[in-house]
């Protein structure tokens, strides 16, 4: 007899996972082993360490849910239902069992009563019949899968790894005798063509977003297009969904405040309308796509092509508005260029006597306009005429007025001759001869420069002779009055002028809109401020007699003509109207006295300094002699600029 070895080898006792697995058991009934702790899988002892010596064999302690016997599932359920009691080991394992979506939906163990009514047994037999039918269908499903070349659930490949045996899909394919379309997508059989869709989307972006061409528009009238200038494609771009919402809002006003009865009536109306809405809508254009052509298209009704560009046609109202704006801009430009507030500030300033006078021709127009002007500013500044009116009543001032008029008549032919500002008159008329000396010095300087004007020199000598005789008599009277005990003039506060620059420095034009500059004096520049009372001053030009030699003085006096008569003086007064102003500008525009920078009339205590000593020489200037001389230039300048601006304003749109 052949010897048969009936013992179990060590390999078979340890590795019998594949042989013990039942093929008929459904994968839905299995629990996965991976990820479970030893106590959850029914193992109560930790495994011993592997050593070289032989380790005794212990049967594996696995819960009943992991044991796959060759018996059917229906027989196991019959045994469980027939058993009157449950073993304690099964209770422990059932409590430890994890509930998952893939776990078997068995009734809880131990809950069935030992004695069951016949109705329950009939129900169980019906369930068994249903399960048998499912298994038969399972076989059909398996056969169909095999024919289709698909891998069935019962088909096991010998290359399955432990991971594939223990882990199943969480959402397995539903069992069905019919082949679903998605089961045929991944076929391994080459004989059967795969029913796969192309993963690459063949539809282009243009086709996907294309909505179709709109319906042709009905004919429109031209007046409608002109009346509504908004293009129609902007109005058509609204989606019908938004328009429907607006209609609903209009149809259902004050819905929040309505009563429940009104709500019910409204819902019934909507239900009546709903059958019409269920109909398939006709293919409508949802939204009009904005193409490049439409974005760059300009309608010839609203745009005109001019100079290579499309310009929007303006209405009559817009054209009138534009023309008015242009006219206003031209008017402002003309006023701002020729007569501005800055020029007015320059004209009204107290320092405009520092500016250049006009020529002989323009000065006549200046004086004539000044006499004719009715402006309050010019009347207030025109104190020279006021002094001439008072000449008859005040004999003390007559000499100074005569001097100014004579000098102006004599200087008609000398517009470029440098002169000094008018000398202030003291409280008493004892030093009126200082002005005569200045005129002598000025004549001497002009002779040295090479300007030979004999006729003018003869006229000046005549005037000097007459002035010397008048000044000697007035000086004697003034000295006697001062010796007898006259009142000294009250000293005044003087301002310390600081050098400041303004926009008038080189920007403000004089006559004919050209800047005229005056050359500085030969021996130096003018003082920046007037001398303080009681202090000796250094003359800019030599004005003392000891500077000249006696021979020069005798030669100069020998040239003096006889004194003119009263008639000649009156005729010279009439000629003075055509002469330039008596007091010309001295220095340049950069002179500190002119750089007021708008600080006139502003009281600053830190700029005032008290006089250091009281003396007979004071700065209490005579108002008529100083203000009249300075206002003459301002009056002439203001009147000329103002008259020119008025003429330009009148002739702006053409002479009428």
UniProtKB/Swiss-Prot annotation:
InterPro entries registered for this protein in UniProt: MDM1
Motif (ST]-E-Y-X(3)-F motif 2): 204-210
Regions of compositional bias (Low complexity) in chain numbering: 111-126, 398-409, 466-482, 625-638
UniProt-listed GO biological process terms: negative regulation of centriole replication
One of the Pfam families matching this protein, by short name: MDM1
Keyword Lyase: no
Composition-biased stretches (Polar residues): 38-48
Function field: Microtubule-binding protein that negatively regulates centriole duplication. Binds to and stabilizes microtubules.
Protein name as it appears in the record: Nuclear protein MDM1
Species, as recorded: Danio rerio
Gene: mdm1
């Amino acid at each position: 007899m052949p010897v048969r070895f009936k013992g179990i080898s060590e390999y078979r006792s340890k590795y019998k996972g594949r042989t013990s697995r039942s093929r008929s058991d459904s994968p839905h009934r299995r629990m996965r082993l991976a990820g479970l702790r030893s106590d959850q899988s029914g193992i109560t002892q930790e495994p011993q360490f592997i050593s070289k010596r032989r380790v005794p064999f212990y049967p594996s302690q696995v819960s009943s849910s992991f044991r796959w016997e060759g018996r059917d599932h229906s027989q196991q359920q019959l045994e469980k239902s027939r058993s009157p009691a449950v073993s304690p080991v099964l209770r422990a394992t059932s409590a430890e069992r994890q509930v998952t979506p893939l776990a078997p939906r068995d009734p809880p163990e131990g809950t069935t009563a030992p004695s069951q009514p016949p109705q329950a047994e009939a129900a169980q037999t019906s369930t068994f019949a249903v399960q048998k039918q499912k298994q038969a269908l399972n076989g059909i499903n398996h056969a169909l899968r095999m024919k289709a070349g698909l891998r069935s659930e019962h088909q096991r490949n010998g290359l399955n790894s432990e991971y594939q045996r223990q882990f199943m899909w969480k959402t397995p394919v539903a069992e069905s005798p019919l082949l679903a379309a998605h089961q045929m997508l991944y076929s391994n059989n080459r004989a059967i063509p795969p029913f796969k869709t192309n993963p690459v989307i063949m539809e282009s972006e243009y086709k996907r977003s294309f909505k179709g061409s709109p319906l042709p528009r009905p004919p429109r009238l031209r007046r409608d297009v002109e009346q509504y200038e908004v293009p129609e494609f902007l109005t058509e771009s609204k989606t019908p969904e938004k328009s429907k919402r607006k209609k609903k809002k209009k149809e259902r006003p004050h819905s929040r405040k309505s009563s429940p009865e009104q709500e019910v009536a409204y819902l019934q109306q909507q239900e009546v309308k709903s059958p019409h809405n269920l109909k398939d809508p006709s293919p409508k254009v949802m939204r009009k796509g904005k193409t490049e052509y439409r974005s760059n298209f300009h309608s010839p009704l609203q745009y005109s092509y001019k100079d290579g560009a499309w310009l929007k046609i303006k209405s009559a109202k817009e054209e009138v508005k534009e023309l008015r704006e242009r006219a206003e801009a031209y008017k402002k430009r003309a006023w701002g260029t020729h007569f501005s507030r800055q020029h007015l500030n320059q004209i009204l300033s107290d320092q405009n006597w520092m500016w250049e006078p006009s020529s002989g021709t323009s000065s006549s127009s200046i004086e004539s306009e000044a006499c004719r002007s009715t402006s309050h500013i010019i009347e207030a500044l025109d104190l020279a005429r006021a002094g001439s009116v008072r000449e008859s009543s005040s004999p003390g001032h007559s000499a100074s007025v005569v001097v100014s008029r004579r000098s102006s008549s004599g200087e008609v032919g000398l517009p470029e001759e440098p002169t000094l500002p008018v000398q202030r008159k003291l409280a008493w008329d004892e030093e009126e001869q200082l002005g005569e000396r200045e005129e002598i010095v000025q004549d001497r300087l002009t002779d040295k420069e090479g300007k030979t004007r004999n006729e003018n020199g003869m006229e000046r000598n005549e005037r000097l002779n007459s002035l010397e005789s008048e000044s000697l008599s007035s000086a004697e009277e003034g000295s006697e009055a001062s010796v007898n005990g006259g009142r000294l003039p009250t000293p005044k506060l003087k301002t310390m002028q600081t050098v400041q620059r303004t926009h008038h420095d080189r920007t403000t034009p004089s006559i004919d809109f050209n800047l005229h500059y005056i050359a500085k004096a030969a021996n130096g520049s003018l003082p920046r401020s007037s001398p303080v009372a009681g202090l000796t001053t250094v003359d800019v030009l030599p004005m003392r007699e000891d500077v000249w030699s006696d021979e020069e003085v005798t030669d100069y006096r020998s040239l003096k003509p006889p004194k003119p008569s009263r008639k000649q003086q009156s005729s010279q007064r009439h000629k003075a109207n055509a002469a330039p102003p008596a007091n010309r500008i001295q220095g340049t525009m950069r002179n500190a006295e002119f750089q007021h920078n708008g600080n006139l009339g502003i009281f600053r205590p830190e700029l005032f300094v008290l006089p250091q000593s009281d003396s007979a020489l004071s700065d209490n200037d005579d108002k008529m002699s100083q203000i009249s001389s300075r206002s003459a230039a301002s009056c002439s300048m203001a009147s000329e600029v103002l008259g020119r601006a008025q003429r330009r304003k009148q002739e702006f749109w053409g002479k009428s």
